[in-house]
Amino acid sequence: MRTNLTKLFTIIFVAAYFNAKAQTDSITFAHTGWNEQTIAKGIRWKSFHFENKSLFNANENINIIEIAPKQKHYRLHVVHSDSLETTSQLALRNNALAAINGSFFKMRGVDPDDNKKIDGKPVLERSKLDYNRSVVYLRENNLVIAENVEKDNKRKRHQQGSIAINKKSVSIVKDSADINWEHQLKGQDVLSTGPVMILEGVDQKIPNDAFDNDRHPRTAIGKKKDGTVVLLVVDGRASESAGMGIPELQKIFRWLHCIQAINLDGGGSTTMCVKGQPFKGVVNYPTDNKKYDHEGEREVANALVIVPR
């Protein structure tokens, strides 16, 4: 009897502790003194470095760009590279006001850019001039650049949701049973990614695995009820910023009052650029050089950019 009571009290204590900690985190986030800068009418860049392990019992560095609804002068746009380019290169090439890295892709392997050889002979993949490395459905300006490819009739986590961009709105949608569901989405730009974190104001179930639970740099996009679009990156893999698991990222978007949110490619790909800022516009701390600085960008296959209409 005493053993059962001890177990019961332990369960109650642990539950109460984590509930109190969650409330503390939400209060901390709600009272954040963001560093804010208007980079264009209706477009704000916000950043904050949570120190002293004040958020999720960790240090966290977060950058956010908010795009007000009914934006007249700028639009969100999906762009791709014929091979691989850094997010800042994609931003510059498209005259972007700001940019974040996009969805998942095949990293550079044995292609001409690497000059790999076997027995003295170059080993080549398909030419970078006619091959996009995105491993998700990508539609740009109504042109399909890449397709989702199912394996064993199953979609991978990064193929289970999409961002659909129209002239005046951005939507986040979840996949359907139809194998060609992305083709039916209305939008001049469509980019598949995942997992979906929030849909119609409801938290979506997040798989209990290492990809989702472990802390990494993360890139994601959300949408508020009034139509405001939220682009977010959180740095990681450093003592200055631990990164987040998907459940923690899900909470951040809920606290930002988003009714839709979806994860993008993260890790060493995570990058945000703002035009006119130093370090080629890179404002976060990309990790591909394993240093906590602004110079560790990874080459990526696609990005989300804010460009003039």
PLM feature segments, named:
Residues 23-309:
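Gly/Ser/Thr/Pro-rich low-complexity, intrinsically disordered segments
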Residues 1-26:
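Bacterial Sec-dependent N-terminal signal peptides
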